[in-house]
């Protein structure tokens, strides 16, 4: 009986920790903006967003549990391609996109609305100087602040959502502002990068659960799986509420307003100036804790990749300097620059997640073939989306849903499975499942 009680408690504790990892304060800007753009179709747009965000992130978590490590998921494509893909993932959830976004979000939601004279360059220098000090010292204060801020942020968000449902700021517009809410929702889900983060986050959670005494794979699956579902339900409630709030102002605002500005306008309309200040402060502090976690994780990964030849502290400094420069692009420009990169690396990553989850014993050559098909298609679609005329691309199946890479991935994977026996004989590895009985 005591054991069950402890298991339930651990599921709740780990679930809340996972929520805070996936949510990240920077992700608060995407659902309201999608809701505003989708207007009367906000629920359809949100459904696509949630599937591409938390749905895929949960699949990534379960795939990790299925095969036992992120290396087992990624290494199917071969050592060098796997390292390149993992580097791309870490760069996206690190210094290229996610870390600079924490600074830009803090400036636009906490500083700019209340202290209009502050230079964004000066702020970014101060912000990352703080991150640098806390990451190098690995201060325990960060953990304490994070545990306090996550519940505060959650309470603040639910207070705003409930008030916005009871007394909406405005009426939902008659027509959407965008032509394809499903594709826009999927791309907004990609921007959160939660599915990419599921692999490194999953390792952290798995290590935490193991440290709590769950050394049996079935028990680990139960605790981590329960925690992932709890985090998913919390994120569903928060993101859906925020998307609805965005829809309620779809008659007042359009794409000319920035993402952070839209959130703060909604908060001010619902909670007043004082509420806007308090919300901005909480979001800003939460961004600090997110930046610390991402910076330390990215620095640790690259230090390990270099096998200690370049120390952890050197990577922390490099990441902070680079992120400070990128953060001055501003939140919306960071999102715009990140979009094509994410559109390219998401499909092959998702292919590996699907294979690890559903067909973990599939030979590596098939995984490589499927990833090549997904990668080629995603590159062509991204080029088309940015003005390059490739006539065949819009005719691809599922193109209108943003999933045109699915069938090419399956075709290339099937073709790889039909390779001659000599090529097959060079296969060296089939990933053993950690929960198999021996």
What spans do the regions from the language model cover?
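Hydrophobic, membrane-embedded alpha-helices of multi-pass small-molecule transporters
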Residues: 13-23, 161-169, 178-245, 278-287, ...
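Membrane-interface loop-to-helix entry segments
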Residues: 136-164, 338-350, 369-375
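Helix-loop-helix connectors at the membrane interface of multi-pass transporters/channels
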Residues: 34, 102-119, 210-211, 291-318
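Selective recognition of specific alpha-helical transmembrane segments in multi-pass small-molecule
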Residues: 55, 59, 152-163, 226-250, ...
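Membrane helical hairpin/interfacial module
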Residues: 35-129, 136-137
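C-terminal membrane-solvent junction of multi-pass transporters and transport-like membrane proteins
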Residues: 350-414, 425-438
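Membrane-water interface regions at transmembrane-helix termini and the short interhelical loops
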Residues: 36, 65-72, 128-149, 211-214, ...
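TM-loop-TM module centered on a large, flexible mid-protein loop between adjacent transmembrane helices
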Residues: 70-75, 238-288, 304, 340-342
């Amino acid at each position: 009986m005591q054991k069950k009680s402890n298991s339930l408690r651990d599921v709740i504790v780990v679930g809340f920790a996972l929520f805070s990892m996936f949510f990240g304060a920077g992700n608060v800007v995407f659902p309201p903006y999608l809701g505003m753009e989708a207007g009367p179709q906000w629920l359809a747009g949100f459904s696509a967003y949630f599937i591409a965000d938390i749905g895929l992130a949960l699949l990534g978590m379960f795939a990790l549990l299925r095969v036992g490590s992120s290396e087992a998921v990624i290494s199917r494509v071969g050592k060098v391609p796997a390292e390149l893909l993992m580097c791309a993932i870490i760069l996206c959830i690190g210094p290229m996109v996610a870390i600079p976004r924490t600074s830009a979000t803090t400036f636009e939601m906490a500083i700019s609305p209340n202290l209009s004279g502050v230079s964004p360059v000066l702020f970014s220098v101060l912000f990352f100087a703080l991150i640098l000090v806390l990451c190098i010292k690995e201060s325990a204060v960060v953990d304490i602040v994070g545990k306090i801020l996550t519940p505060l942020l959650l309470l603040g968000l639910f207070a705003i959502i409930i008030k916005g449902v009871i007394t909406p700021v405005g009426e939902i517009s008659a027509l959407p502002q965008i032509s394809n809410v499903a594709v826009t929702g999927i791309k907004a889900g990609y921007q959160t990068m939660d599915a990419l983060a599921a692999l490194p986050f999953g390792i952290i959670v798995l290590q935490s659960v193991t440290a709590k005494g769950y050394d049996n794979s079935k028990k680990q699956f139960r605790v981590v799986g329960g925690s992932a579902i709890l985090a998913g339900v919390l994120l569903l409630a928060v993101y859906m509420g925020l998307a609805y709030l965005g829809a309620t102002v779809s008659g007042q605002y359009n794409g000319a307003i920035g993402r952070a500005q839209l959130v703060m306008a909604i908060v001010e309309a619902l909670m007043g100036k004082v509420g806007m200040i308090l919300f901005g402060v909480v979001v800003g502090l939460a961004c600090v804790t997110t930046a610390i976690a991402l910076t330390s994780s990215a620095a640790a990964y690259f230090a390990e990749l270099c096998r200690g030849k370049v120390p952890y502290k050197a990577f922390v400094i490099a990441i902070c300097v680079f992120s400070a420069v990128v953060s001055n692009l501003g939140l919306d420009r960071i999102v715009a620059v990140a979009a094509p990169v994410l559109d390219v690396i998401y499909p092959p990553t998702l292919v590996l997640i699907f294979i690890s989850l559903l067909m973990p014993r599939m030979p590596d050559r098939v995984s490589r073939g499927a990833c090549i098909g997904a990668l080629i298609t995603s590159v062509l679609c991204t080029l088309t989306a940015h003005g390059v005329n490739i006539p065949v691309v819009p005719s691809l199946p599922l193109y209108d849903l943003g999933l045109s890479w699915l069938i090419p991935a399956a075709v290339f994977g099937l073709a790889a499975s039909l390779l001659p026996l000599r090529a097959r004989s060079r296969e060296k590895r089939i990933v053993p499942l950690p929960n198999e009985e021996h």
